[in-house]
């Protein structure tokens, strides 16, 4: 399994005080020295964490592939085509969201996504689409010309957390998931099945398959059971763990959990 370490949240901490501490390049170095197979960053339109200068520096100094996440905004795409990352993952984006809330609407925004893919391909940049784990979204991704899909695991992660963590007893409990445990268990199994079926179908029609969003040290084993998934992109949980263990140890432990 290929482990993509998302270092956005290192930049979140830096931007909280508008200083160069922690240094994003230090995070890049430590992550790659301790098992990261890929570095993932999200260059958002609102620049809430990763800045343009970060993206250019990471592209310059990374000795592993860089997976750059971005929206289909033309101004952002112009920067991406200049950066020429090893891969671009197109993601949905809303300014008011705390984090990416769902997969790309590959049907509703078909023309805009097709244009973005064509533009990136003109610069020889492979494209992945961040999609909800449905057969329809997988098939549309193939039709649009993407080489890869990243299956959005957020719904799975939320259900897992409400069943198996202290989340229900915190201020961040997910109100719509405050359900009896047996109902949560049924929904969790359905979410895992949806990811499994989407991954198998994607592989069958010639797409590479990644997964990400909300994956952590407690739930990642479920994704490891799906052979068609060959890449996981994980960020917040690694950076959160690093507060207590150090970034190097946090990356090493996740690499151990995601090794086949």
UniProtKB/Swiss-Prot annotation:
One of its GO terms (biological process) is pyridoxine biosynthetic process. The record marks 150 as: Transition state stabilizer. Its EC number is 2.6.99.2. 3-amino-2-oxopropyl phosphate binds at residues 6, 17, 214, 235-236. It is an enzyme of class 2 (transferase). One of its GO terms (molecular function) is pyridoxine 5'-phosphate synthase activity. It is found in: Cytoplasm. CDD domains: PNPsynthase (cd00003). InterPro entries: Aldolase_TIM, PyrdxlP_synth_PdxJ, Pyridoxine-5'_phos_synth. Keywords: Cytoplasm, Pyridoxine biosynthesis, Transferase. The active site is at residues 42, 69, 213. GO terms for cellular component: cytosol. Pathway: Cofactor biosynthesis; pyridoxine 5'-phosphate biosynthesis; pyridoxine 5'-phosphate from D-erythrose 4-phosphate: step 5/5. It catalyses: 3-amino-2-oxopropyl phosphate + 1-deoxy-D-xylulose 5-phosphate = pyridoxine 5'-phosphate + phosphate + 2 H2O + H(+). 1-deoxy-D-xylulose 5-phosphate binds at residues 8-9, 44, 49, 99. Homooctamer; tetramer of dimers. Belongs to the PNP synthase family. Catalyzes the complicated ring closure reaction between the two acyclic compounds 1-deoxy-D-xylulose-5-phosphate (DXP) and 3-amino-2-oxopropyl phosphate (1-amino-acetone-3-phosphate or AAP) to form pyridoxine 5'-phosphate (PNP) and inorganic phosphate. This is Pyridoxine 5'-phosphate synthase. It comes from Sulfurimonas denitrificans (strain ATCC 33889 / DSM 1251) (Thiomicrospira denitrificans (strain ATCC 33889 / DSM 1251)). The gene is pdxJ.
